[in-house]
Amino acid sequence: MKITLLGAGAWGTALSIAFSGKHDLTLWSREVDVADDLRKTRENHRFFPGYKLPESVAVSTDFEVAVAGAELLVVATPIAGLRPTVERLQALGCKLPVLWVCKGFEAGSGKLPHQVVAEVLGKEALCGALSGPSFAEEVAAGQPTAVSLATNDPAFAREAARQLHTTRLRIYANDDLVGVEVGGAVKNVLAIATGVCDGLGLGLNSRAALMTRGLAEIARLGLALGAERQTFMGLAGMGDLILTCTGDLSRNRRVGLALAQNKSLPQILEELGHVAEGVYTAREVDRLAARLGVEMPISAAVAAVLDGRLTAAQAVEQLMARDPKEELA
């Protein structure tokens, strides 16, 4: 299959490596210097150092040329880049199926990725999300990984999963696109909370409680948006939550660890040097939960800490001071 990956960041590079043995690939880069580096050294020193891009992967900075001839497009930008990318596809009259790997709610609109794509390309456009417990570094290194592929057409999900599946990247088809996207978005917020918990030295009991109650928050929001409950017990729910909350490669977890040290958010993001989607998603989740009347106290506490309304320690005190509840109510 001819696949074009749009975006030469960590995920675009990692998936180019992962899919290279099975497909005819083109990696499109917006940054000319990144493309030049990839062509000359076969390494993305700016965004993803330490991993070699196979010679078989073509690198392009010409958007129209990169898209031409492809059978499948994979948008590998942060969510902030999703709309501009699909708008360029729409301008070309592109009718190709589109997948994305970004996770979150669009800043300002609060839309999930599939809503953004449908708004730009039309509801009839074949599209879907590749999501689950996966760090780009481990995917590029060929470590065994399993993810979900959810689309707006079950037959397309099954066929795309079959085509993209490799011996190192196991892909499960899923027909709950909303659930997969909500799981991938909100877990980033909860990873910040877990980082705060660990950074304050609150212990493993606290971490386990936070993750479990956080999963309940994901499910409540997802159900309010029309998702299926069982999705949150799978790879894009519990699986991604566990990885992002406990893995040291998690940018969102590292944000939480730094917040526990009372570092300012601008300083944290500057030191991180990469996008941490949970920082932006927290505010959208907080607004969406309020609008839908969904109780999400952990996510709300994260938003309050990020906005400077609470310190990390105050947020913990506030959560623990809440009235007793029935666990499964």
Curated annotation (Swiss-Prot):
Binding site for sn-glycerol 3-phosphate: 103, 132, 134, 187, 240, 250-252
Record's subcellular location: Cytoplasm
Active site residues per record: 187
Gene, per the UniProt record: gpsA
Record's protein name: Glycerol-3-phosphate dehydrogenase [NAD(P)+]
Annotated metabolic or biological route of this protein: Membrane lipid metabolism; glycerophospholipid metabolism
Keywords: Cytoplasm, Lipid biosynthesis, Lipid metabolism, NAD, NADP, Nucleotide-binding, Oxidoreductase, Phospholipid biosynthesis, Phospholipid metabolism
GO CC entries: cytosol
Ligand binding (NADPH): 11, 30, 103, 136, 251, 275, 277
EC code: 1.1.1.94
Primary role: Catalyzes the reduction of the glycolytic intermediate dihydroxyacetone phosphate (DHAP) to sn-glycerol 3-phosphate (G3P), the key precursor for phospholipid synthesis.
Catalyses which reaction(s): sn-glycerol 3-phosphate + NAD(+) = dihydroxyacetone phosphate + NADH + H(+); sn-glycerol 3-phosphate + NADP(+) = dihydroxyacetone phosphate + NADPH + H(+)
Homology family: Belongs to the NAD-dependent glycerol-3-phosphate dehydrogenase family.
InterPro entries linked to this entry: 6-PGluconate_DH-like_C_sf, 6PGD_dom2, G3P_DH_NAD-dep, G3P_DH_NAD-dep_C, G3P_DH_NAD-dep_N, NAD(P)-bd_dom_sf
Record-level GO BP terms: carbohydrate metabolic process; glycerol-3-phosphate biosynthetic process; glycerol-3-phosphate catabolic process; glycerophospholipid metabolic process; phospholipid biosynthetic process
Classification via PANTHER family: GLYCEROL-3-PHOSPHATE DEHYDROGENASE, GLYCEROL-3-PHOSPHATE DEHYDROGENASE [NAD(+)] 2, CHLOROPLASTIC
Signal peptide segment: none
